[in-house]
Amino acid sequence: IEEQAPAVFTMLSKLGQELYMPKGILTQGAEAKEKAHKFNATIGIAMENNSPMYLDCIYDNLKAFKPTDIFPYAPSSGKPELRKAWQAKMLKENPSLKGKLISMPVTVNALTHGLSIVSQMFCNEGDYVVMPDKFWGNYRLTFSTISDGVLTTFPTFHEGGFNVDGLIKKVEEVGKLKPKVIVILNFPNNPTGYTPTLDEANRIVYGLRNLADKGIKIISVADDDY
């Protein structure tokens, strides 16, 4: 990352800059799933009739799936075929990503776990985290209590719509104090359920890009749980 995307590297937290995928059992296990067609000695698992052993009372509710697809250990970052299909969907729905260097998506154990990973990878003590003033407590726990980030909010609504100007003004304000800013874009907003109009979405993109062009390092987090 430091060589191919130095700007991104500087946005990572101290922990994020040191994280790596260990080349032990996780890597070897992933390679074995792909290449070990006869023997796989990387994992201990009880087999019966060339299939993982399981309880009938569990499989009775999962007949739509093959036992080999649901009972063995799942890869830590998600099943490769799911991740590839997910990336293909992203590229289809976002043509502007074509030709860009992006990573394969990874799976997480629900929303707060995903936010926690983002927080660990990008948020240092004292980093500003900008979000609307309508939010649930898991944001405070994840970005403030755990990562020691500074939560700063703006009024969610203005004149019956999303407060785009308030968002941009707040990012610019804290960006002058510290040039790295984490922006949480949670749409549909939880708990209000509000989704920006197309015009509001375009104004958000334009405003954030304009601030980025001025030198503010913006980490835009799309929290789209729905």
Sequence positions of predicted segments:
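Conserved PLP-binding active-site segment in aminotransferase class I/II-type PLP enzymes
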Residues: I1-M21
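Conserved core of the PLP fold type I
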Residues: P67-S220
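Walker B catalytic acidic pair
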Residues: D224
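N-terminal small-domain helix-loop-helix segment of the aminotransferase-like
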Residues: K14-N109
